[in-house]
Amino acid sequence: LSPNARALQQYIVETYPGVQSIGGVRPDSRPDHPSGHALDIMIGSDMGLGDAINADIQSQTGRFGVRYTMWRVASHFNHVHVTVA
């Protein structure tokens, strides 16, 4: 993982104990995951947790170098996708 992704992952683990798992580097046709600049924060069916995490990340874009998040769109209903610089 990139330094920003690693820092965000650690923050999420420490702040949100309800998170089921966090995916990072994996093969994909887009470069974000293979390059280690994306996380998938798995929240299962807890939409409130996903809302809280997404809002928190959006409020700290500078801290983690957030480029964008995906939540409640395009099959992102059981996890929050975050791409960082």
Q: Language-model features: where?
A:
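Secreted/periplasmic proteins that engage bacterial cell-wall peptidoglycan
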Residues: L1-V80, V84
